[in-house]
Structures are given as C-alpha cells and as structure tokens.
Amino acid sequence: MAPVRKSRSVNKRFTNETSPRKDAGKSKKNKLRKKLSDKLGPQWTRLELERFYDAYRKHGQEWRRVAAAIRNSRSVDMVEALFNMNRAYLSLPEGTASVAGLIAMMTDHYSVMEGSGSEGEGHDASEVPRKQQKRKRAKPQRSDSPEEVDIQQSIGSPDGCLTFLKQARANGTQRHATGKRTPRVPVQTSFMRDDREGSTPPNKRARKQFDANDDVAHFLALALTDASRRGGSPKVSESPNRRTELSDSSPIKSWGKMSRTRKSQSKHCGSSIFEEWMESSRERKLDSDKDTTLLMDMERAGEMEAPRKGKRVYKKRVKVEEAECNDSDDNGEACSATQGLRSKSQRRKAAIEASREKYSPRSPKKRDDKHTSGAFDALQALAELSASMLPANLMESELSAQLKEERTEYDMDEKSSTPEATSTSSHGEKANVEPDDSLLHAISSVENANKRKSKPSRLVSTDCDDVPTGKLQPQTSGSLRKRKPKVLGDEAPAEFSQNKSINKKELPQDENNMKSLVKTKRAGQVPAQSKQMKTVKALEESAITSDKKRPGMDIVASPKQVSDSGPTSLSQKPPNRRKKSLQKSLQEKAKSSETTHKAARSSRSLSEQELLLKDKLATSLSFPFARRRCIFEWFYSAIDHPWFSKMEFVDYLNHVGLGHIPRLTRLEWSVIKSSLGRPRRFSERFLHEEREKLKQYRESVRKHYTELRTGAREGLPTDLARPLAVGNRVIAIHPKTREIHDGKILTVDHNKCNVLFDDLGVELVMDIDCMPLNPLEYMPEGLRRQIDKCLSMKKEAQLSGNTNLGVSVLFPPCGLENVSFSMNPPLNQGDMIAPILHGKVSSNTSSPRQTNHSYITTYNKAKEAEIQRAQALQHALDEKEMEPEMLEIVKGSKTRAQAMVDAAIKAASSVKEGEDVNTMIQEALELVGKNQLLRSSMVKHHEHVNGSIEHHHNPSPSNGSEPVANNDLNSQDGSEKNAQMPSELITSCVATWLMIQMCTERQYPPADVAQLIDAAVTSLQPRCPQNLPIYREIQTCMGRIKTQIMSLVPT
C-alpha cells in the first residue's frame, strides 16, 4: 500500500511557530537594557562613578559639565545614559542616596548582563532538537483498518495506559473522564473517531466529513428510490423539506441512542454501517405492527431526552407555536411567574401530544392505510437519520431558506387578501368550514406581525392559560399543510361558498362566540391586538359621545368582529385614530360641563352662594380631624391668650425700632441674624422647656386672680387679661367628648370652673379649656392699646395710598415713642448716594420740574429712610450690648454735643459784619456751661471740619429728615450764610471727643472702653467720599488706642 502524501498544512503549522523562551516576558526590558548598555560605552570603573556622582550633585543635569568633570573620555550621551539607568535612585535626596549605592547598582547591572548572555547561548543550543522533535511527532499515518490505527497510536502515545485502552476498545465499554481536574462522571464520547479527529489536521477532518456525507446521501437516495418503486407514499411527496424539519426531532436521537453499541464497534468500518442500516430497515419492513410499536417507543424516548438536553423542537408546526410563545415570553409578556410556568408546561404537553398524533390515525377511515404504511415509516426514520448526519451549518441554512420561503408565501397571501370592510364575511366562512386552518392562519400571521414589530410591548393577555389543550391539538395535526389549499379555497365555486354561508347561518350563536373567544385568546399575545381590545372597551363606554362626530360608523364592536377581522387587519389601521376621537369627545364633554357650570354660577344670587359656602363649611366641620385642627388653631383660653400673643422676635423688632416696617432689607436681616445668634433645634427638650415656662406663667396668673378675688390685690398688670366671672358666656371644651360647646359659668375656683352647657348639662371644666365668647372684652389693656394703634396705622396707610404697609393685629409693635432717631449716625450706604443725586439734580435743572422733581424726591426719601433704619438698628444693637454705665456715657455725650453744636451754629449764623466769629462761638459755648479749654478745642475742631467741607463744596444736610436733593446745592451766591452746616458730622465728632474725655476721668473696664471706642468710630462715618481719607486716619489712630487699652485686659 502506497504511503499517503503528507499535508503541507501540518508542517506549516509547526515551522512557522517560534520556539518558546523562558524569559519571553522580559524581552522588552532586556532590549531596553541593551540599548542603555550600548550607550554606556565600556564598563564604568569605581573612580568614574565617584566622579560622576560628585559632579551630578554639584551641577545637576548639565551633562557637559558632568562629563568634563569625569575626565576619562566619557561623552555626554554616556553620562546621560548612566543617569537614565539609575534615575529613580539618583532622584532621591542626597542624604538617602550615596556613592556606594550607585556603585553597587552598577556592579549588579553588569553581573546581570553577563548572566543573561550565557543563558541566551544555552537557549540557542537547545532550540534545534526541540523543533525536530515537533516535526517528527506531527506525522500521523493514515490507515483504514482499526488494527493499524491501534498500532500507530501505541507507538506515538507517551503514556503507559496502553493495555487499559486496548481492553476498553475491545470490550466495547465506555471510558470515564479520569483527569486530574475533571469530575468523576461518565462522559459520552465516541472512541475511535474522536482519537482520529484529534490527531488529524482540521482540513483533512472536514474533507473526510464531506466525503462521508456524500456517501450517505448517495446510499439513502438509492434506498428511497427502491422503496418508492415498491409502493409510493404520499408523505414523502408532501414534505420535500422533511429532512431539514426532522433533523433535531426526538426519534433520531433515540435511534442513535439505541444503536450506540453497534456504532461504537463499527464506526471506523466505512461501508459496514450502511449495510447494517439496510438490514435493519428490511427487517422492520417485514413486520409492520412491530415497526409501529418501535416508532412509538422511539418517540417516548425522544420526549424524555429532549427536555434533558434543553431542546423543545419537535415538528414544524410545533416549532411555530413554541417560537410564538417563546417570543412573547422573551419580550416580557408573561402575566406572572406562576402563570408563565403553567403556560410553558401546558404548551409542552400540547406539543408532545401533537407530535404523537403525527403517527396516530386522524380518522377511522385512514386507520387501515396507516397500518399498511409501516415500511414507509421505516424509510422515513432512515431519512431522518441521514439528515442527522449532515453538518449543522447546512441544516441551519436549509431551515432559514425554508422560513424565508414561508414568509414570502404568506406575504403574497396577505397582499392578495381583501380589506377589512369587505372580508369579514369571508373570514367567518373560512372559520366555520375549516376551523383548524383558519386558527393556524391567525397564529402564523400573529407571529409574523410580532416579528415585524420594532418595539416589544409588555402587555399580554392574562387568558393565555385558559386555552384548553383539546383546542390546540387540531392545530398541530395539520401542521404539514401549506398555504396552497387556502388559495384554492378562495377560488372555489360559488355553489360551495353558498353552502358555506348556509352552514354558517345554521350554526348557533353561542358556538360562534366561543370560537371567536378562542381566537381572541390565542391572538391576545400580540401587543397590537391587546391594545385594540382595550380601545374597544373604552369606546363602548363612550359610544354616545362618539356617535355625535361619527354617525356613520358603528364604534361598539363585539369581540367576534375583532377576532374575525384578523390581527393583520387590525395592524393595518392607524393605531391612534380612535384614541384621538375619544380624547376629542372627552374634551368637548368637559368644555360643555364647564360652560354649564359657569352659567349656573352666574345665575346664582349672592344669598345662594353664601348658603353654598355654609354648606361646604358644615360639611368640612363634620369631620373630627377638621374640628381638632380648628381647636388647635383658634381656641385660646383667657389665661393663655396673652402668652401666645407675644413673640420674642416681634419684641426684639419693637426694641430696635423695626416693628412697624413691613419689609426689611438684606442688610437689616443680616444684622438681625448676627445679633440673635444661632436658632434652637426643634427637639423634645425644647418643647419640654416651653411647656415648663407655660406652666409657670399659668400659675403666676392664677395667683394674681386669687389675690384679686380675696382682696389682697387691687388691680391687675396691663399685660394680664380680665378673669372670668360668674354668668359669663364661654366656649368650652367638654371634658368627656373633647368637643367645643357653648355654655355659661356657674362657679369659679382656683383653676377650675363649673360650666352649664346648653345641651349637655353641668360639667367641671379646667380654666385653660374655657374661652370667652367675645375675646376682645377680656383682652389685656396693653394689648388692647397696641391693637388700636395698629388699626389706626393701617387706616392711615390705606387713606394715604400706601397699601404695602402690612400691620399684624395679633403682634403689634410697641414702644415706638421711646426710639430716638436724632442721634443715629449715617452709614456707608449713603456715601455714594449724594454724588449720584447731585448729578441728577444738576442734569435735570433744565428739564421740567413736574416730571423729575417728584421722582427724585420719592427716590431720595426711600433711600434716606432705609439708611436711617439701618443706623437705628445698628445703634440699638450696640446699645443693647453695652453696659448701663457705658450707655449713659454715650447718651450724655451725644446730648451735650448736640446742644453745643446747635449753639455754635446759631452763633455763627448770627454774626454781623465786623464781629469775630470765634468770639461769638466762645460766648455761645460759655452759655452752655463748658470751660475755656473745651471751648478752644471745639472751635479748632469746628474750624477744621468746616474748612474741609467748604473746600470740597459738598456739604451734608443739617437734618436727617430733609433730603439731600432738596438742599440748594447749586445756589449762585457763594456766601457763607447760605452754606449749609454739616451739623450731624460735627455732632458725632464732638460726641466722640466727649466720650473719650469722660472715659479718662474715671477708671472703667478696658473691654467696655474698647466697645465704646468702636461705637464712637462707627458714628464718624462720613457721607462725602472726599472725607474718607480723614476717616481712615481717625480709624487707624483709634485702632492703636484700642490695642493699647485691650493689652491691659487680664487673661
């Protein structure tokens, strides 16, 4: 026997491979080191490394200087290569790195390089025999007999399990996977073919497979031709693609499982396996009954094997049904977990029963023909076995081609069908004559509609589990039928169609409804149809309103009509047409109801509206939670009303003089927040403390009332309400029901009183549960005056047209008369106001005063009021933080300074010609009662400030209430008499000087003195920007004095 020619691919595969190296992962590092070592030049000596290290520490990375310092013909590249090789070590600080470390690293480098060179020589020497060994091993000899295969494998196998392998192959036993990492479970393998395929290259293996398949196909064609000569079978002609359809079915797998031992013994014998198949087929042809029972057993075995391997494909129509159900499950259309499992199990049972019915007689007439065709069943099983031996890719390609042909055929049928309006009767006729075919047509069309959809819907019919399996069996029995009978049925004679219509009319209505319901449930998995069913239900409810717009169409459609129209006709319609009409009808209905409601509301009179409101209020108060809310919100006893009428924040605003202002600026709020501090957290401890305060207040009020009754006290404080007396009408909370009722006081005790309720009798009620029928009569006197004042202020504001003034009735401001605005200094906000307003006035002198004067006045007044409020707030806060003695000093200094400035200004304004101004001012100050030193200092200070103001020609107003724009700033005569005096600034300067003088006369705490200086310096802020440099100098000097004073504070 001539030797087989070698395959070039075997040698190519081994000759193109490179020999593996142990140091393959270090190849890049070795290359990099070789490059750096090449740049290093000859080996560096110890002296050169010491010189390099010293020069590097001295010159850094200036490699020319470093190379010149080594003086041993070392170039710049060599020096730089040495640095790059030891960059990480040389980057360390000088104390950490050293010369000895660098020398050690280079010595190690050179030793490593020498070792790697010697290892490379060893690898090169051992590379050649390894390649030769691989080439020798890759020469398998091809042989057809199993004995020669065993000999060749025994020669080439390196392990020592040869005897065991021979025994296992000879006895036909099954090997087990006994590797180190494999589980100890039996593995289904084929012995000889796997060994041969593992030792042969892939191209030879594929060639062998195709040759074997061609031989099998040729042999099976001959066998089928021989069988067809004996007697033709309609099953073979009806299913030209039978081989592809039944390639994965259960009888094939069971056939291979039953003949596994014979195939394992005769797998390597080329033509013996086909002879055995022919003998077995001829034996089955002799006894038809035995063959029928054998096929039934094969089906049961396949049914048991198919769920284990995870394949649920049985026949063609079963595939269609399961694809439909799996598609719906994959798209998330399962109703619930239990329903999904139940539906899967039912579909599986139905498919198994349908596959059994393939071989069961459909009618009693064909039962004899079924028994006589056992031989053809055996041939059919042989064809299935041949299909199982085909390659998987060919089977998949044939299956995809078949599915494409079916889709195109169905699309042609769909195009040839009539529209929905004219085809409802034909659909019904088809459903009555051939219910199985029509139902299959609906299912397949639903499946195609699902595949054509771009968006998967999550809506699914919950009735899919209710479909009985008996209804599904006729579907699968006709699964091998094509669309041709349906096309021929459409071209039937007119007499046959008339018979169909007559039969349809004779059927009962209930039976038609049941059939349509089954169709609807089976097609309910389609999202489009489920949506249309929901639309129909919605339209049934709104049929009256929809008929107005669409009188010619019958909107209320029954489920029978929807099912007869078919899913394809439903999908052809626009999806939102009915929804749009429904929305329009609902909108029109809402508009009509609104118009009628408005007309009814306009026609009502005022009394009817009041009665309606009363009814609504009574209805809301009928709920216990609403009454409880009203009690908490508005029920206050005579004792608790003054306590809850007070608010600490409002008291604070009244104290600083801002209680009457409806809106505060950002500056004012920032000052208030900074002065109040951090608010408390609403916690249980806070509530406990507040309740304790309320208890103490109640006890003190009761004590006052008891003393008043006994005669120990003649009157009550103005902040306490009048006590309740016998005979007063009250609104009390009943102690049993905790509901409010009207009553009358019979007796009064320390903290309780007897109340006679109108309908419930006499009960003992706490004083905190009794509210006067008219709370204004029992209001404290101080609170009454405040409320009256607030009401009067509100009326004045309404009369003046200022509606923005909001005054609270419960929390009115108090103590406004105690706030003085005469000593409030200006702040920084006014510094830029005066020049802007001055420019506006000068630019608007030529314009009519009727248009601009009122605007400027209003704007100036608002700004001035805002500045004054900020000044008053800051001043009040400063005074609140001061000690009483310091507060007296500030007030006294400002009072005396104001009097002195007024006297000096009056004297300077009354000077006549020829008189000395200084003399007149000194006389005026003597009248005030100050000594000569103070008078001389005051005059000098006054001359200095007055001169600076006159030099800049921008005087400040003498009165804070007068606006800046109203001053005659642009007067033509420049006489000093008409010039306005900066009285406020002068007063602030004199008051500051007096404060400092009074602090030096007595010894005060340094902290209080520093606080007083801060308040004095703050009051000196000028309005004119030209005076800011002088103010900065004063501020600097005062800061030094404050630092010296604070240094005396004990720590």
UniProtKB/Swiss-Prot annotation:
Residues 323-332 have a biased composition (Acidic residues). The lineage of its organism: Eukaryota, Viridiplantae, Streptophyta, Embryophyta, Tracheophyta. Residues 39-93 form the SANT domain. Expressed ubiquitously in vegetative and reproductive tissues. The keyword Nucleus applies. InterPro entries: DIRP, Homeodomain-like_sf, LIN-9/ALY1, Tudor. Residues 1-11, 27-36, 131-140 have a biased composition (Basic residues). SUPFAM superfamilies: Homeodomain-like. This is Protein ALWAYS EARLY 2. Keywords: Nucleus. Residues 1-37, 114-158, 170-210, 225-293, 323-375, 397-605, 948-981 are annotated as: Disordered. GO terms for biological process: DNA-templated transcription. Interacts with SNL1 (via PAH3). It is found in: Nucleus. The keyword Lipoprotein does not apply. Residues 120-130, 279-293, 350-372, 403-417, 586-597 have a biased composition (Basic and acidic residues). One of its GO terms (cellular component) is DRM complex.
